[in-house]
Every structure is written in structure tokens, then in C-alpha cells.
UniProtKB/Swiss-Prot annotation:
<keyword id="KW-1133">Transmembrane helix</keyword>
<protein>
    <recommendedName>
        <fullName>Uncharacterized protein MJ0995</fullName>
    </recommendedName>
</protein>
<dbReference type="GO" id="GO:0005886">
    <property type="term" value="C:plasma membrane"/>
</dbReference>
<feature type="transmembrane region" description="Helical">
    <location>
        <begin position="12"/>
        <end position="32"/>
    </location>
</feature>
<keyword id="KW-0812">Transmembrane</keyword>
<keyword id="KW-0472">Membrane</keyword>
<keyword id="KW-1003">Cell membrane</keyword>
<feature type="transmembrane region" description="Helical">
    <location>
        <begin position="80"/>
        <end position="100"/>
    </location>
</feature>
Length: 227
């Protein structure tokens, strides 16, 4: 009878190993990997595009409640939680960073390509390529990655502080032809053309540093920053 009991227990253990353990491992993996990029550097390293606009997980979770998405089925809205971030290239390419995205290399999905850990739709070869850490990116604080706009001659980082209900934006751009910039004039112009409550402009030699602070969570800045 003891032998029958042990056989029964072995079957249960085998069942758990085959059927339950993989689910637990997958669940733990997803739990550990759902969420946005750790910092600006990770956004750059994961980018499949040479220039891009990046929207982080935190921002996507706010956007899913946007009025423009009110007619979207609830299932699709809630599935946004599985997206780490979205990359938008200059020529219409669209990249989605998700956990287990590497499986697409082995299980192809129609109309999607896989590159650098990102699923890409509407691929334009002019977009494809590695972005690089440079002096502009290195000037952006690591946590200003809720939205990151990366271009050859400027970079914009946006941070949404949900605790204080404020939006912070930093732009660093290269001086056109290294020309002189009137920082006070630019500061006044930015305060007039935006609804910023604070602004600071710093001449850094070959580039200019711009800091803007807004009351509230301004999701409209995603479109083009302050330009």
C-alpha cells in the first residue's frame, strides 16, 4: 500500500512539474519584467531606430484612459499593461517593447519584424538602426524617460511626477552653426508660447539646456515637446 501511495505522489509531483511549474515561472518572469525602462540609457540601448519618440509604460497607462480611446474595446486597453514601451520612428515605423518579445524570432507574427528586442510594424528601412548615447542624452536626467524624443541635433526628456501632479521637461539642443543664443530672450519666448510655470535656459557652449515645469500632467507634450 505504501508503494501505491508513493506512485500516486510521484504522479502528482510530475503533473505539477509539467503543468504548473512553467506557469509559475512565466508568471514570475512577467511580474519582474512588466513595467517601463529603468532609465534614459536603457531606452537608448533598446531602441531599434536611429531617431525616435519613445513612450514609456507609465505614460501608456495614463494614455489608455484618454478620451480619444474611449471607443477602444476594454480588452485592448487593459492589454497595454503588458507593453514596456513604444518607439515611433521618423518615417512611420512603430516598435513595441514587450516581455518575451524575443520569441517572435522563433514564432513569427504576420506584419511584425523583430529587431534589438523590439517588435516592429510598418518598418521603414530609413528608420532602422542603433541610437547612440551622446553628449545631448548624457545631459538628460536618468528618470526623464516617461517620454523621450531623440533626434540628431536635440533630445527632449519628459518626467511626470504623479505625486506633485507636475510635468517636467528638459531639452538639450545643439546650437545651429554654433551661433550665440540669447538665453534670457529664449526663456521669455518659451514662457509666452507655453503654459510653463517655470523656465530656465543655460548656455553650455556648443549646446543649450532648457528646463520647463508645468502644473498638471501634460500629455500633449508627447506630440513634439515644446517646438
Amino acid at each position: 500500500m505504501y508503494g501505491d501511495y508513493m506512485k500516486y505522489m510521484k504522479k502528482i509531483v510530475l503533473f505539477l512539474i509539467i503543468n504548473i511549474l512553467p506557469i509559475l515561472i512565466l508568471g514570475l518572469y512577467l511580474y519582474a519584467n512588466i513595467g517601463g525602462a529603468e532609465d534614459v540609457k536603457e531606452v537608448i540601448e533598446n531602441s531599434p531606430f536611429k531617431e525616435f519618440t519613445y513612450i514609456d509604460h507609465k505614460t501608456l497607462m495614463m494614455l489608455k484612459n484618454d478620451v480619444n480611446l474611449k471607443n477602444m474595446p476594454e480588452f485592448y486597453k487593459e492589454s497595454i499593461i503588458l507593453i514596456n514601451g513604444i518607439y515611433i520612428g521618423n518615417h512611420g515605423s512603430f516598435g513595441i517593447k514587450i516581455p518575451l518579445g524575443f520569441l517572435i524570432k522563433y514564432i513569427p507574427i504576420d506584419n511584425f519584424k523583430y529587431y534589438n528586442g523590439v517588435l516592429i510594424k510598418n518598418l521603414n528601412e530609413d528608420d532602422l538602426g542603433k541610437a547612440e548615447m551622446n553628449d545631448l542624452v548624457n545631459t538628460i536626467p536618468p528618470n526623464y524617460k516617461d517620454v523621450l524624443i531623440y533626434r540628431e541635433n536635440y533630445t527632449i526628456g519628459i518626467y511626470y511626477d504623479l505625486n506633485s501632479n507636475k510635468t517636467y521637461l528638459i531639452e538639450v539642443f545643439r546650437k545651429p552653426n554654433n551661433q550665440e543664443i540669447d538665453t534670457e530672450k529664449l526663456r521669455n519666448e518659451l514662457l509666452q508660447k507655453t503654459n510653463a510655470v517655470d523656465c530656465n535656459v543655460v548656455d553650455m557652449g556648443d549646446k543649450v539646456y532648457v528646463y520647463l515645469e508645468f502644473n498638471g500632467i501634460d500629455l500633449n507634450l508627447i506630440n513634439n515637446g515644446i517646438t
